[in-house]
């Protein structure tokens, strides 16, 4: 086994408590998660926010890893300071350097168990493809959105997000915890297979590429004027057809989808995205080949 160190982060958002609870239970019962010999460094991303049950204190930690924020000595938001600390401790050049990061999240949307990859780095996609081949998890490929930047996993050589839902904020739910545990274990098992030189990569894998986001209709004061239509709520991953109901006004009027390409909505009515003016994101399904160069890039990173 190589000297690979994997940073396992939970509680990046302080009101997502299932991941932190799993890490706490794991510390008391090590056999809860089989690491398959991979070195794992568990850490709570935003412990102050977790203690208060809040998503964040000053700003979203998972948008605080932009280079301009990290390089500015004058920005003292607690999440930006925490982002710098995490990199100082666990970044590639940190005191306890980690090459790969797995960031655990939960969502109020009906996303099931999902892998989220930011950008199109070959090592991220190779790892996600390995995990998808083991568990069949969908991959949400989020790139090309200038309004959403500064994600934690982008600052490590390789990283992905495990997103599990639906679960209300601040609520422990056994099914969510078990899904998180299984996904973490699959990640570590996949990395162990790479480290031992025995990975079984698929010839191709499926991603859902980010197209953009839709907001709720809003009034002149910027307040929501309609809500997500009840027939759409909970239907993440189901293609939108022409004329499908999107939003419902208080008087019963329905706003319908007018596109023709049957995009696939994700993170429908996510509670945390209200402040970001996102009612849902739209994706398109892509079947991607898995080049040998990507596999080699992940192998090289793991062997370092």
From Swiss-Prot:
It holds the Pfam family AstE_AspA_cat. Substrate binds at residues 55, 62-63, 163, 273. GO terms for cellular component: cytosol. One of its GO terms (molecular function) is hydrolase activity, acting on ester bonds. Its EC number is 3.5.1.15. The keyword NAD does not apply. Its cofactor is Zn(2+). HAMAP family: Aspartoacylase. This is Probable aspartoacylase. It comes from Prochlorococcus marinus (strain MIT 9313).
